[in-house]
Amino acid sequence: MKSFPLPIKAVVIDLDGTLLNTAPDLAHAAELMMAELGRPCPSLETISTYIGNGVSRLVKRVLTGEMDAEPDPALFAQAIASYQKHYGEHVSLHSRPFDGVVEGLQAFKAMGLHMACITNKAEQFTVPLLKGTGLYDYFELILSGDTLPKRKPDPLPLLHACEVFGVAPAELLLIGDSLNDTQAARAAGCPVFCVPYGYNRGRPVTELDLDAVVPSLAEAALMVTKA
């Protein structure tokens, strides 16, 4: 059991569902895609449960209505091209930081902690989204889903961040919202907090192997100290 405040040297934070409420823009792109395909679109609530494994998997879930099913390859090729076009045009139209995010980032910065954003979202969407919502400049390092050969739940992005920052895994805290985050953290040997408001396939984060559930990033900042 971890003791608090937790001594750390770096904090890395997930994007969708942790920093930003991106579901409205992700769902809007899905609606436009499905309209082009002449198909009905799932609800915003349903699409929110599909978020967290990158755009390709999101599109497959929207097409099939299942978490791990594979759609017809020709249909998927048409759908992913449509989705990427529409999402790229509206990546930060309705996406906003969750309550406490900016305050939390400011607190981490004031502590002198290294800060990174680690997401499974492709770089072509990650960077414009962070810039469009005013969060880009908080981070020394941004690792997207296609930056490295592997992404969360693989530990590689976290271990890469440790290497870049010159810290041990136990000194790097991951804050996320899903099973991907907790699995990556445990595999890397990092502590992990989760927020309860994100996109964990519709499941409560209390089911996950984590060190704390934090109501907001502002609350998370109160639970750490610089090592």
UniProtKB/Swiss-Prot annotation:
Pfam families the UniProt entry points to: HAD_2
InterPro entries named among the record's database cross-references: HAD-like_hydrolase_sf, HAD-like_sf, HAD-SF_hydro_IA, HAD_2, HAD_sf, PGP-like_dom2, PGPase_prok
A GO molecular function held by the record: phosphoglycolate phosphatase activity
Pathway note: Organic acid metabolism; glycolate biosynthesis; glycolate from 2-phosphoglycolate: step 1/1
Membrane spanning stretches: none
Keyword set includes Metal-binding: yes
Catalytic class of the enzyme: hydrolase
Keywords: Carbohydrate metabolism, Hydrolase, Magnesium, Metal-binding
GO process terms (BP): carbohydrate metabolic process; DNA repair; glycolate biosynthetic process
Catalytic reactions of this protein: 2-phosphoglycolate + H2O = glycolate + phosphate
Protein EC: 3.1.3.18
Residues where Mg(2+) binds: 14, 16, 177
Cofactor dependency: Mg(2+)
Domain of life of the source: Bacteria
Gene Ontology CC entries for this record: cytosol
Active site: 14 (nucleophile)
Annotated family: Belongs to the HAD-like hydrolase superfamily. CbbY/CbbZ/Gph/YieH family.
PANTHER family in UniProt: PHOSPHOGLYCOLATE PHOSPHATASE (PTHR43434:SF1)
Role noted for this protein: Specifically catalyzes the dephosphorylation of 2-phosphoglycolate. Is involved in the dissimilation of the intracellular 2-phosphoglycolate formed during the DNA repair of 3'-phosphoglycolate ends, a major class of DNA lesions induced by oxidative stress.
Name of the protein described by the UniProt record: Phosphoglycolate phosphatase
Phylogenetic lineage: Bacteria, Pseudomonadati, Pseudomonadota, Betaproteobacteria, Nitrosomonadales
